Amino acid sequence: MSWAALLGLLAVLLLLLLLLSRRRARRPGEPPLDLGSIPWLGHALEFGKDAASFLTRMKEKHGDIFTVLVGGRYVTVLLDPHSYDTVVWDLRTRLDFHPYAIFLMERIFDLQLPNFNPSEEKARMKPTLMHKDLQALTEAMYTNLRTVLLGDSTEGGSGWQEKGLLEFSYSSLLSAGYLTLYGVEASPRTHESQALDRDHSADVFRTFRQLDLMLPKLARGSLSVGDKDHACSVKSRLWKLLSPAGLASRADRSSWLESYLRHLEEMGVSEDMQARALVLQLWATQGNMGPTAFWLLLFLLKNPEALDAVHAELKRIVWQAEKPVLQMTALPQKILDSMPVLDSVLNETLRLTAAPFITREVMADLALPMADRREFSLRRGDRLLLFPFLSPQKDPEIYTEPEVFKYNRFLNPDGSEKKDFYKDGKRLKNYNMPWGAGHNQCLGKSYAINSIKQFVVLLLTHFDLELVSEDTEVPEFDLSRYGFGLMQPEEDVPIRYRTRL
């Protein structure tokens, strides 16, 4: 062996010795500490492979709070839903989401914003997603869903068409959402302009979907060389599609878009970075609705009793409406708010499939009080992680048969919404958390709920829809998606649909 090789081996051994000597020890008052068997990496491989299974094992071993080593970072995991409010409402000087958000923004979307303040941005965006602006968004979304769904069905004729359910749901909702937020070809609309809208928004979806499929690897920095080249190409295409100059001529742009672009200009953001910011916002506002609709429709198609209950509710609404749903140019908020069965189906779908990580950076050494009066010390520089998918959403103490879809789980016997769920004999405030919580709860929650419900109503009132094979099983999750919002399936589910005559 050459001297160079020996010196290299010695350097590696010294580095390993250094890493081993720096292995952290648990201090009094801290959560249980699990370092794993590999220096520095710790549990990174297990966590990345299947976060839910890994964290379930850790909970069984250590209880509802513990610290694990993951790729050089110490992550304290809290799985007691009674104690979540302590975290999500804490001061940013103690527990802050912003550093992690900025890290993902730069790593996934190549986006750098000067003096970026997520709290200020949310405050600017909030009015454009609520109240009167929410009504305008909801009405525009209904119009654009009709353009995407009914225009395509007219062009395709009245016969059966086959497609993957995820592709169908995702493409329909993202295309309509893009037109709603970023504008349409012309106003007033014509048959020609609507056809152009369908083609253009479909192009946006196809390109976006390529980026979406790479998102977990982008976030973890694990793309191959070939994938990196492909990611760069896809991002460049999206930046061109969503450039401020390209969007300037579009009609009926949302107040959200106008406000957000003004905000970016006031910050002195270049047009190139503005385009990247708009790609980020396309993912943030539209990336979860399509997968949600996929799971919801699949659960309905696999559960005839649930589908019958939703159909019965829609018939009641049609009977009570001032004019037929088929003739409505918009679904009034009053109608959208009077669908308790569909609301329960949506909540149950989200309970089973929404799996975001709620993360905070620990900004100072602090004591974290638990709901049961215990208190644990957290160290500055660590990361705190909540995973509501495990608890409360999949907790057998809170939900009987938590792995089973029950369409009426969130309904009381009198048909009203059920909100009373318990753990350890105490009523839970946070019993289902697909939208996050506290300072970082999703601003677009109402817009997303309205959009998904409108999509389901249009689909069930205008189309016949069925599985290609009745024996189709509910697919397994793509395990790499844990932490990024709605889970996606490992494979799509073939369906057939046709316009109802």
Swiss-Prot record:
InterPro entries: Cyt_P450, Cyt_P450_CYP7A1-type, Cyt_P450_E_grp-IV, Cyt_P450_sf, PTGIS
Enzyme Commission number(s) from the entry: 5.3.99.4, 4.2.1.152
Cofactors required: heme
Record key words, sorted: Endoplasmic reticulum, Fatty acid biosynthesis, Fatty acid metabolism, Heme, Iron, Isomerase, Lipid biosynthesis, Lipid metabolism, Lyase, Membrane, Metal-binding, Prostaglandin biosynthesis, Prostaglandin metabolism, Transmembrane, Transmembrane helix
Single Gene Ontology BP annotation: response to estradiol
Catalytic activity: prostaglandin H2 = prostaglandin I2; a hydroperoxyeicosatetraenoate = an oxoeicosatetraenoate + H2O; (15S)-hydroperoxy-(5Z,8Z,11Z,13E)-eicosatetraenoate = 15-oxo-(5Z,8Z,11Z,13E)-eicosatetraenoate + H2O; (15S)-hydroperoxy-(5Z,8Z,11Z,13E)-eicosatetraenoate + AH2 = (15S)-hydroxy-(5Z,8Z,11Z,13E)-eicosatetraenoate + A + H2O
Molecular function in Gene Ontology: heme binding; hydroperoxy icosatetraenoate dehydratase activity; iron ion binding; monooxygenase activity; oxidoreductase activity, acting on paired donors, with incorporation or reduction of molecular oxygen; prostaglandin-I synthase activity
Membrane topology of the entry: Single-pass membrane protein
Gene3D superfamilies: Cytochrome P450 (1.10.630.10)
Chain sites annotated for binding heme: C442
Binding residues annotated for substrate, in chain numbering: R107, L113, N288, T359, R360, R383
Record localization: Endoplasmic reticulum membrane
Source taxon at top rank: Eukaryota
Ranges annotated as spanning the membrane: 1-21
Pfam families: p450
GO cellular component annotations of the record: caveola; cytoplasm; endoplasmic reticulum; endoplasmic reticulum membrane; nucleus
Family recorded in the similarity comment: Belongs to the cytochrome P450 family.
Protein purpose: Catalyzes the biosynthesis and metabolism of eicosanoids. Catalyzes the isomerization of prostaglandin H2 to prostacyclin (= prostaglandin I2), a potent mediator of vasodilation and inhibitor of platelet aggregation. Additionally, displays dehydratase activity, toward hydroperoxyeicosatetraenoates (HPETEs), especially toward (15S)-hydroperoxy-(5Z,8Z,11Z,13E)-eicosatetraenoate (15(S)-HPETE).
Protein name: Prostacyclin synthase
